[in-house]
């Protein structure tokens, strides 16, 4: 099972009525409304966090400047072309919004969350750096920060317990997934962020094409 959302929302990058659709309106972030088994990240619900269009949510817009406070997001692992790969170390494994600004401790913005991959409770993210930043300028385990309002609890993406009622979980964030390396890009069975195509297990699979599947390199 993969990180496939459902409903009318999700993470729309380009328009249409929802889904984690990166430009069109048909092949979108699919899935069931009410959760299900397997410990995967399932989207759902209305809204979501789009890059442009959709039904509202965290849309890409003009930067509003640094937040009032920042909290720890993760640590630098290694560069990847012009981006950087980091280990997520948020409190309680909270998940950052896609495209959320990433800061140094002094609130200087270095870039934005670009991809997420790894296991559900042990995941990584890449940062698309700002034009004035160089991937080679960061040190191993250097810490990065985020606006606490740009984080969602992991529970938003887990299956709902049997018998629990309420709106579908998900509709939260995602990342393009896809595999930038890091300490465990694919992960084993049982749930996680997968960068490759096909395979068993489940969780954050990223990339182009229909659904939130692997982008490859």
From Swiss-Prot:
Keyword Glycoprotein set for record: no
Gene Ontology cellular-component terms listed: box H/ACA scaRNP complex; box H/ACA snoRNP complex; box H/ACA telomerase RNP complex; chromosome, telomeric region; fibrillar center; nucleoplasm; telomerase holoenzyme complex
Region Disordered, residue ranges: 1-65, 156-217
Keyword Amino-acid biosynthesis attached: no
Stated role: Required for ribosome biogenesis and telomere maintenance. Part of the H/ACA small nucleolar ribonucleoprotein (H/ACA snoRNP) complex, which catalyzes pseudouridylation of rRNA. This involves the isomerization of uridine such that the ribose is subsequently attached to C5, instead of the normal N1. Each rRNA can contain up to 100 pseudouridine ('psi') residues, which may serve to stabilize the conformation of rRNAs. May also be required for correct processing or intranuclear trafficking of TERC, the RNA component of the telomerase reverse transcriptase (TERT) holoenzyme.
Assembly mode: Part of the H/ACA small nucleolar ribonucleoprotein (H/ACA snoRNP) complex, which contains NHP2/NOLA2, GAR1/NOLA1, NOP10/NOLA3, and DKC1/NOLA4, which is presumed to be the catalytic subunit. The complex contains a stable core formed by binding of one or two NOP10-DKC1 heterodimers to NHP2; GAR1 subsequently binds to this core via DKC1. The complex binds a box H/ACA small nucleolar RNA (snoRNA), which may target the specific site of modification within the RNA substrate. The complex also interacts with TERC, which contains a 3'-terminal domain related to the box H/ACA snoRNAs.
Protein name (Swiss-Prot/TrEMBL): H/ACA ribonucleoprotein complex subunit 1
Lineage, top ranks: Eukaryota, Metazoa, Chordata, Craniata, Vertebrata
Annotated gene: GAR1
């Amino acid at each position: 099972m993969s990180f496939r959302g459902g409903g009318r929302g999700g993470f729309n990058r380009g328009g249409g009525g929802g889904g984690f659709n990166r430009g069109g309106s048909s092949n979108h972030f699919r899935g069931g409304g009410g959760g299900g088994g397997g410990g995967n990240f399932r989207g759902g619900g209305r809204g979501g966090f789009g890059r442009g269009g959709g039904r509202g949510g965290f849309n890409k817009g003009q930067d509003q400047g640094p937040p009032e406070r920042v909290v720890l997001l993760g640590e630098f692992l290694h560069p990847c072309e012009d981006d950087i790969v980091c280990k997520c170390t948020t409190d309680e494994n909270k998940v950052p919004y896609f495209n959320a600004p990433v800061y140094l401790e002094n609130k200087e913005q270095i870039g934005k969350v670009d991809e997420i991959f790894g296991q559900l409770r042990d995941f990584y993210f890449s940062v698309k750096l700002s034009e004035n930043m160089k991937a080679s300028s960061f040190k191993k385990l250097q810490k990065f920060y985020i606006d606490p309002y740009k984080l969602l609890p992991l529970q938003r993406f887990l299956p709902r317990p049997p018998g629990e009622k309420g709106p579908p979980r998900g509709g939260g964030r995602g990342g393009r997934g896809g595999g930038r390396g890091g300490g465990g890009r694919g992960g084993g069975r049982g749930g996680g962020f997968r960068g490759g195509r096909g395979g068993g297990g489940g969780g954050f699979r990223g990339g182009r094409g229909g659904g939130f599947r692997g982008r490859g390199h």
